[in-house]
Amino acid sequence: DVDIAWVENTLENMSLEEMIGQLFCPIGYSTDPEYLNMLLHFHIGGLFFRDGVAEEMQSTFTYAQEHTKIPLLIPSNLEAGGDGAATNGTAYGKQMACAAANDPVYAYRLGKIACSEGSALGINWAFAPVVDIDRNYHNPITNVRTYGDDPEKVYAYAREYLRAADECNMAVSIKHFPGDGVDERDQHLLTSVNSLSMEEWDKSYGSIYQRLIDDGAKTVMAGHIAMPAYQEHFNPQLKGKIVPASLSRELLVNLLRDKLGFNGLVITDATPMVGFTAAGKRSETVPMAIENGCDMILFNKDLKEDYQFMLDGYKNGLLSRERLLDANRRILALKASLRLHEKKIKRQLVPGKEALKNLRTTEHIQWAKELADQSVTLVKDIAENLPILSLIHISE
């Protein structure tokens, strides 16, 4: 197979420094070429930007792809529409709005708008759909970002997003493994906990992940979320310890790889979050995240420092060569599955400016208006004020 040959040939000819660099997907804070060159100097595997003006983002991604040896993964938080990629993209609606409209077609349209508009900029990886479950309404992360509290509905709607993403040749990242929405605390501030039993998890989150993996989801985002039931099941010595999934071999290898059969790429959630940083010294946790089952590190406090931590971790044995090669192979395989190696040769990694006409199309705007209408939900009407009729004056 030509694609496999590209992966293996590329890997065989990579230096240690290049393999270390591929493990990182930093966030960009400037579109200045000098700044971009600094990031690219570390042989990064991916590059993330928050939403910006479409023309500027497209130009930035073009520059980055033209100045890197191995094509970049360009991810974006495409959770609610094209506005996740560009400020002048279509703001479609949150996942909860799709669920409230009560038809999976709205989730398909979300995926179609988000991924087609993202693709127009050169984005090739959606950090979506969110497949968390709103089990606890106090949770500060999930709420309107999810498809609700019914696992079957969450799966059905996430599957439609995945279908649309596939049509746009966009990789998805189902998140946040092993599942947010149980705890009411925020991983930005600490390591939160999914406290479900193994049986409860299997029937809910586990069922969602299993089916989406079987449907072809290419990547999984590991949250800074512990799940004691499964962690202690696979390793009784962890009893009483809170270890985030992003650092847990038990959850990433024993559960995700071995039990659920996932063979794609695993990326951490943002590692400057306290849910990750509180787990130990960064000089240890950065290489340990890869050693314990993640394939890429999302964001950095300092890319140069993290790069050195990873390199030192490899040299002192925290990161094995076997795991380094495996992670790089998965990164390259994802790129090959998206035809990035072929697009680089043809200089087609980022579309031309004419592709920007796909943003805020008449159809996309109409879809957004329809979702806004259909997602309005009556929660309660104790005073029986609805429907509002022109003949009735509430104040009387």
Predicted segment positions?
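Short glycine-enriched loops at secondary-structure junctions
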Residues: 28-32, 74-84, 124-134, 174-180, ...
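Second-shell residues forming the walls of enzyme active-site clefts
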Residues: 57-67, 82-84, 149-323
